[in-house]
Structures are given as C-alpha cells and as structure tokens.
Design a protein with these regions (language model features):
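Positively charged n-region of N-terminal signal peptides that target proteins for export
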Residues: 1-5
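Flexible, solvent-exposed loop/hinge segments and secondary-structure transition points
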Residues: 22-161
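Bacterial N-terminal signal peptides
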Residues: 6-17
Length: 161
C-alpha cells in the first residue's frame, strides 16, 4: 500500500511540474521594421553607394535589405551572411573570424551561412542579440563596413533598453 501511495505522490508532483512548464509564455525582444530600416539607411549613408546592407531579426530572418546604386550583386549574400554570423555568435563577425582562425573552434567555420569576414555586428540589449546588421562592398574594406554598421546601431542606441 505504501508503494502505491508513493507512486501516486510522485506522479502528482511530476504532473504539477509538467503543467506549469507548459503554461509559461516566452517574451522576447525583437527588432522592429522601423528600427531595422533606420539602422540600414544610416549604415548605407555612412558608407558609400557601393555597399549592400542586410538587417536580420533575432531569428535570423531578413527584415531589411538595401543595395546601393553601384553595389555588386554578390554583396547581398555576403552582407546577409556577415549579419547572420554576428547574430548567431553574439559578437562582430570580425571578432568571430579571429576567434575561429585555428584550434578546436575552427570547425565552426564550416557551419551553414556563417562567414569569417568582418562587416557584421550584433544588435544587443544586454546579453540578448535582438538582431544584426551586415555590410559588404565598402571601398575601405571590412573595417569600414563594421564602422558603418556600428553607426547604424548607434542611431537607435537609445531605444535598445
């Protein structure tokens, strides 16, 4: 009888935990289309008409893509992948490229859609990446692309709380 009572008690406790876990609703911050557009326009204006700018939301979906008048066609994919790399690793794509240049973490470079090139910057609220921006095609190279991406984020910094 005591074994049966213990079994019933354990099942009741497990049932209480599982039903309360299902009842929780996640609340996540994400980048709005207006914020994404402001970041992209600012980054494009800071750089040159030759760049492409991609802004992704927290799930890696493209929110905004701007291609400058003189941008090369391949810059769309490069900008998106730089932004994706920054988003998924929550650091600039240049920092990630340095970190994965050799050693045990070098294998991360073979993951789909990541790219070891600078020009991608995460959009952070505390420790959470709510989006990212990536640029490609700046005549000053990856350092200029990163600076332009950061200028775009700086434009909305007061809203990132």
């Amino acid at each position: 009888m005591s074994v049966r009572l213990s079994l019933v008690a354990v099942l009741a406790v497990l049932g209480a935990f599982s039903s309360s876990a299902r009842a929780q609703v996640l609340s996540e911050k994400n980048i709005s289309i207006k914020m994404a557009l402001t970041i992209a326009e600012t980054a494009l204006n800071e750089c040159t008409p030759r760049v492409s700018v991609a802004v992704l939301d927290r799930a890696g979906r493209m929110r905004v893509f701007l291609q400058g008048d003189n941008a090369s066609p391949h810059n769309l994919e490069l900008a998106r992948r730089k932004a994706y790399t920054a988003l998924t690793f929550r650091r600039t794509s240049a920092e990630w490229a340095k970190r994965t240049a050799e050693g045990d973490v070098a294998g991360q470079r073979s993951l789909t859609d990541v790219i070891p090139l600078g020009g991608g910057v995460p959009i952070m609220i505390g420790e959470d990446a709510i989006g990212s921006v990536g640029l490609s095609g700046a005549p000053g190279g990856q350092a200029q692309e990163e600076a332009c991406a950061k200028a775009g984020i700086a434009k909305v910094q007061d809203q990132l709380k």
